[in-house]
């Protein structure tokens, strides 16, 4: 009964966050940081009756202005993630993250993670140096496709963009429409031909719910049927076919979406 998390919590080490754990019998030593401690996390998952978890971190939101230091931060975090993933690989997978503001470094880090045995990586589209339809990303799509390492994308916004104010409904409106902000990324990947050129490229759109997905796919198909093809990015299939072959969408508590799919 009840939940083991508190949506009003303001941090993983705050008393407000830790109280729900302790109330449900999870043993937490003083100073424990549950998301960063795999043993505590597994205990939490057992209490919640969750078998496995794919975990997104927030590396992209860390404000590091020096590029070389930033790259070191990403490498250190990703090395840590791969260590965590050895503890119980059937149940915990902490996604290594790519520094998408720096495409060349992004490619290097993807290559390093593939060599380290990563099953998937996080690709945040909100902080990219160039839009995902730009040619600068072609080497990344090719590498991920060849290695068959999925790129995982989470809903959100630009790291340096603050939430709208909690005033006159602005923040609630932003949060209410957050699941839809991956629709543009999906459409750009389809229409730039990334999936056409790289048939084994897999992209997972995470925690975005799925109620919008059938409409978005149908509307993308209609563009192909009603508009002149773009000669710079020819497609041999409908967007709905690329969606089925190359994409996945995860959700929670989406009754409408489950009925439509």
Specify the residue positions occupied by each region the protein language model found.
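Helix-coil boundary/capping segments in enzymes
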Residues: 1-261
């Amino acid at each position: 009964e009840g939940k083991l998390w508190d949506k009003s919590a303001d941090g993983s080490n705050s008393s407000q966050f830790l109280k729900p754990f302790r109330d449900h019998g999870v043993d937490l030593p003083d100073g424990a940081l549950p998301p960063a401690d795999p043993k505590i996390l597994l205990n939490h998952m057992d209490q919640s009756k969750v078998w496995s978890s794919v975990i997104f971190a927030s590396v992209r939101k860390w404000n590091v202005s020096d590029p070389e230091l930033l790259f070191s931060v990403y490498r250190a975090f990703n090395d840590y993630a791969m260590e965590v993933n050895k503890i119980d690989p059937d149940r915990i997978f902490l996604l290594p993250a790519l520094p998408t503001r720096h495409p060349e470094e992004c490619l290097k880090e993807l290559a390093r993670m593939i060599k380290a045995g990563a099953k998937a990586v996080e690709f945040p589209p909100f902080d990219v140096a160039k839009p995902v339809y730009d040619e600068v990303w072609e080497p990344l799509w090719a590498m991920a496709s060849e290695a068959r390492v999925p790129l995982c994308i989470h809903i959100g916004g630009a790291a340096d963009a603050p939430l709208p104010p909690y005033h006159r409904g602005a923040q609630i409106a932003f949060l209410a429409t957050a699941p839809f902000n991956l629709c543009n990324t999906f459409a750009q990947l389809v229409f730039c031909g990334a999936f056409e050129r790289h048939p084994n490229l897999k992209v997972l759109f995470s925690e975005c719910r799925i109620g919008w997905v059938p409409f978005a796919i149908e509307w993308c198909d209609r563009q192909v049927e009603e508009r002149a093809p773009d000669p710079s990015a020819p497609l041999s299939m409908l967007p709905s076919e690329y969606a089925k072959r190359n994409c996945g969408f995860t959700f929670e508590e989406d009754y409408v979406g489950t009925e439509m799919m």
